[in-house]
Amino acid sequence: MKFELVFIPYPGIGHLRSTVEMAKLLVDRETRLSISVIILPFISEGEVGASDYIAALSASSNNRLRYEVISAVDQPTIEMTTIEIHMKNQEPKVRSTVAKLLEDYSSKPDSPKIAGFVLDMFCTSMVDVANEFGFPSYMFYTSSAGILSVTYHVQMLCDENKYDVSENDYADSEAVLNFPSLSRPYPVKCLPHALAANMWLPVFVNQARKFREMKGILVNTVAELEPYVLKFLSSSDTPPVYPVGPLLHLENQRDDSKDEKRLEIIRWLDQQPPSSVVFLCFGSMGGFGEEQVREIAIALERSGHRFLWSLRRASPNIFKELPGEFTNLEEVLPEGFFDRTKDIGKVIGWAPQVAVLANPAIGGFVTHCGWNSTLESLWFGVPTAAWPLYAEQKFNAFLMVEELGLAVEIRKYWRGEHLAGLPTATVTAEEIEKAIMCLMEQDSDVRKRVKDMSEKCHVALMDGGSSRTALQKFIEEVAKNIVSLDKEFEHVALK
């Protein structure tokens, strides 16, 4: 029996890419399965590469993996604080798209049965649409199992009126939270801003309640990476979790305008000794002001290590403008910096991160701790130094440094939040230099543990590996639910 899943990714380039990779993996593993991906209008205009990527997806549609692009006609420009409103506005469009899909299938013999919705972690309001059609909902969670478990626990504490974290003082709090899914007490001051801010906390608590309505949750993680968390989740009263990662976009993301830059960077790396270069890159939304840039430059020069630095100027409003290039680096960097470091360092703007991490010359990665970047570094066996900037990255830093021992810390506690516009404290050159020296130690325990975890990540995706097994269990569960749905419909019809 053929069956189909309807995927609804969050309208942002990073989430869309991850969802597409998940969909490709599923159809590759199960010949009876087809997938329709409904692409919603993006919240922010001008995301780098978004329009070209969506156009390429549309052109690649086939009978196993289709892309339904919802028009952005009359789409208002909105701020991040109205994500929930944006998703609610899309419900009628999703409803009509699915209804048309069902109508098309009803007129064609041997058409697949729709087996359910697979929703992005930020699209949980679409559960209501799935329920209207009588379809079960599953979720694709693009972050770690750890932050999923913490969100559940915060929601439970809020429902019991036991969560008393104050937005006004959490950054200076000495209190800790004992999350049952973590082996160590979690400092309140390390909470993601969204789990402390008055504006955001209700949004995430409501999301967590919706998470509990799912039939199952696909998580972009590896059983061997988060065993303590996954063991807890498997014994709790939450939906079953399927760790199917690492799910990475490792193909060349071709962009003709950047091909020459890519080649120049890779040629430079190819001339460096193995494991000798520290790579600094902070994601598409990571940038710094002039004072912080100078501190980084001083640290790099003092360390004496070879470096590749993806340097970008901080944006005054991240939702209206992504970080960009400095007009004149000579005016920003310490006087004579380029002359003194020309033989050991290279300062760039945009970076082909996957290609860089895959190069044997890279020996360490100073990162914002985005979950995709974290998984990429583990996949290529590159140890990291944690410099969280926004979203759940403070948690990821805690997980990698304190829980797992797979990263070195630059500083223990981080103030401010890029997305919320909260000022971040300047990290000193001394702190950065110390972390780089620790990161680049060739025989460190962290490096050995990262190499071991890299091997486990590769094995997880092989036949018989933990992630392959989890993926197969998910497919079997979806197929089993179709049979259950058919029996329910038959029972109703007999009545």
Curated annotation (Swiss-Prot):
The keyword NAD does not apply. Keywords: Glycosyltransferase, Transferase. GO terms for molecular function: UDP-glucosyltransferase activity. It comes from the Eukaryota. CDD domains: GT1_Gtf-like. UDP-alpha-D-glucose binds at residues 284, 351-353, 368-376, 390-393. It is an enzyme of class 2 (transferase). One of its GO terms (cellular component) is cytosol. The keyword Transferase applies. It holds the Pfam family UDPGT. InterPro entries: UDP-glycosyltransf_plant, UDP_glucos_trans, UDP_glycos_trans_CS. Its EC number is 2.4.1.-. Belongs to the UDP-glycosyltransferase family. This is UDP-glycosyltransferase 71B7.
